[in-house]
Amino acid sequence: MQEQIIRRILLHLRFPFSFFLLPVFLFALSTLPDIRPEQTLLLAVLLHLLVYPSSNGFNSLMDRDEGSIGGIERPPPVPIQMYKVSLYMDIAALSLALLYLEKTVVFLLSGYILASRAYSHRRIRLKRRPVIGFLTVSLFQGPAVYAMVVCTNTICIGSAAWWPGLATSFLLVGAGYPLTQVYQHAQDARDGVMTLSRLLGIPGTFLFSGLLFAALGLALGWYAWQLSARPTAAVTALLLLLSPVLLYFLRWAAATRQHPDNADFRHTMRMNLLGSTALNALFLTWSVLNHLPSHVR
């Protein structure tokens, strides 16, 4: 019985799902001229191995989903022990951040955890409200994480130079987030949750995400051309790596117009995996290009 509880807890923490949230972190690194390796690695561990999984587990506990959820096609019941596990993981993350990272990062990390709890908790349930739920996820998984990375590696003084990065990180999350809800309409309706995707409908969700993807493409193109040390190589990498993602999105959107049942768990997870892999590869490539010795450039 104890082993079964542990297996279920580990499953609902959804550690592999952190890969889908990695692009914002890597994007922020790709825009920085200098990096503090030890602090950056610690922040990456705190976010991707403690805070994100803790948020996943708490969300599963509150949702009590019986159908597919992000990363799990057939989720088992969530053990009640998940509440304490998620709490201890958050405490560990904040304690380590308080010891080794900037106070601003601790503040942002605390805000992320509180927003995550407010999003999922049955008594608050921000996810019930389509616009507020969308903004909560997009702002805290996007600009807040971007700011954490910047503040970990530079003097944390807000300036106009931050705005393009904050806006782009918002688009990185906001463009794809409604697509993760398209297969959960019936499940969300039973739970009394009106997500943005339910509000827009399946065709509206693809149109909305398509518009944000277009804005994201323009923002990334501007970054590649204006800020990269090797703009031609950066733009080439952008086109090569993101073209397959665009093609898949367009084909999937067309398929759902013909048969709405194609807005399902498996298509969504493929989109997540393809998009995250391409973006992670792109931002790693940009980081390498921006930190090559000048004689190599």
What is the role of each PLM region?
Residues F20-A28, P77, F134-V150, S197-T205, ...:
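Small-residue-rich segments of transmembrane alpha-helices in multi-pass membrane proteins
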